[in-house]
């Protein structure tokens, strides 16, 4: 049956990692917040993700920065009880830890160091992408982060998690849409 709708299909050969399941869940959570335009997840399986098609416009991505900034401010008002997400997910193809701090602390600097920096560094070590000098520098950074971020008193909030110019688009009406989150 041809409904006349156009879709966007992301597909991989081996869907065993769970990346599309995580991406679909992240898109749904962002969509529920209603703060930013998010494409509808039409269907999802281990090796595919089917999304509504967004017709891209010809406007520069710079043209919507103010609107996107206001939308992010609204999104970041959606608070949770803890930093993280109910399940681990992916930053691209790389596993991302979202579990609460192993020290029981529920502050942003601790979560950021343990779940973002140290976790990704451990993957780099495991895969042979680092050396002792870099590891020593990272240890210095881990110890400096709490001081650098002191006084921020950030509350847990819903984040896109992988924002860069390739993960948002501008539709034909000049409105921004977010894609490919790592919430």
Q: What do these predicted regions represent?
A:
Residues 157, 162, 167:
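Conserved catalytic-loop position in the HRD/HxD motif
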Residues 6, 48, 156-158, 176:
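Hydrophobic "anchor" residues on beta-strands that sit immediately upstream
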Residues 27, 112, 163, 180-181:
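Generic structural signal for small/hydrophobic residues in well-ordered secondary structure
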Residues 2, 34, 163, 172-174:
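A generic beta-sheet turn/junction motif
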Residues 2-110:
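ATP-binding pocket architecture of kinase catalytic cores
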